């Protein structure tokens, strides 16, 4: 029997990363209150702790709602990403005004994109071993002309992504580069997930669906 991969995220970027890496996951979106978790941790919580707590909460929520036939043998992947700039963590801007302000702050500078990952091994309907870890990648932002920034914000893309930018979409035009793992910037670090799967005694090739 093939172990099924379950992605606990609505992120099209994370789904694309897995698909391009040979895995067609089942997508089960969690109903986690992210703001409540961040508030409970407090402003002084380290960024890796914050994203790992969010990823773990998402994975736990998804485990509880797995279809019976999938819970027989699967691994759940929960992720969450946030950008740290000037010691402050930011998630999805949500509004055009917030996205515009975010870009005005980070244009021409560098920030750290943190992604928390939580993998839960589920067999015979029971959640077993769990791995939780974060990865960080430095992102170097360009300085888009005002008209370009306005067009990008108007596209709607930056409103629903951590840090108000994407590497693999329209936002990629306005990045000068990344130092580290690019898949982590998209929202799921393939090198880290491979190591976490190995610790769960799961082989990456055995999970390929093509």
From Swiss-Prot:
Enzyme superclass (EC): hydrolase
Keyword Metal-binding: no
Catalytic activity: a ribonucleoside 5'-triphosphate + H2O = a ribonucleoside 5'-phosphate + diphosphate + H(+); a 2'-deoxyribonucleoside 5'-triphosphate + H2O = a 2'-deoxyribonucleoside 5'-phosphate + diphosphate + H(+)
Cofactor: a divalent metal cation
Gene Ontology MF annotations: nucleoside triphosphate diphosphatase activity
Gene3D superfamilies (UniProt xref): 3.90.950.10
InterPro entries: ITPase-like_fam, Maf-like
Protein location: Cytoplasm
One GO BP annotation of this record: nucleotide metabolic process
Disulfide bridge positions per record: none
EC number: 3.6.1.9
Assigned protein family: Belongs to the Maf family.
Protein's UniProt name: Nucleoside triphosphate pyrophosphatase
Species of the source: Mycobacterium sp. (strain KMS)
Highest classification ranks of the organism: Bacteria, Bacillati, Actinomycetota, Actinomycetes, Mycobacteriales
């Amino acid at each position: 029997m093939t172990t099924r991969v379950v992605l606990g995220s609505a992120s099209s970027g994370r789904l694309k990363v897995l698909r391009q890496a040979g895995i067609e996951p089942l997508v089960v979106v969690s109903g986690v209150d992210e703001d409540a978790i961040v508030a409970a941790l407090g402003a002084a919580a380290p960024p890796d702790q914050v994203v790992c707590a969010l990823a773990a909460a998402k994975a736990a929520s998804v485990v509880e709602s797995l279809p019976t036939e999938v819970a027989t043998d699967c691994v759940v992947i929960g992720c969450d990403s946030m950008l740290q700039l000037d010691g402050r963590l930011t998630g999805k801007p949500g509004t055009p005004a917030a996205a515009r302000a975010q870009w005005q702050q980070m244009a021409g500078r560098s920030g750290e994109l943190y992604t928390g990952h939580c993998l839960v091994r589920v067999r015979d309907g029971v959640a077993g071993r769990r791995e939780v870890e974060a990865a960080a990648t430095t992102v170097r932002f360009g300085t888009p002309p005002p008209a370009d920034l306005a067009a990008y914000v108007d596209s709607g893309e930056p409103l629903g992504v951590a840090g108000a930018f994407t590497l693999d979409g329209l936002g990629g035009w306005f990045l000068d580069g990344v130092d580290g793992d690019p898949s982590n910037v998209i929202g799921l670090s393939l090198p880290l997930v491979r190591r976490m799967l190995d610790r769960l005694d799961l082989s990456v090739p055995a999970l390929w669906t093509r």
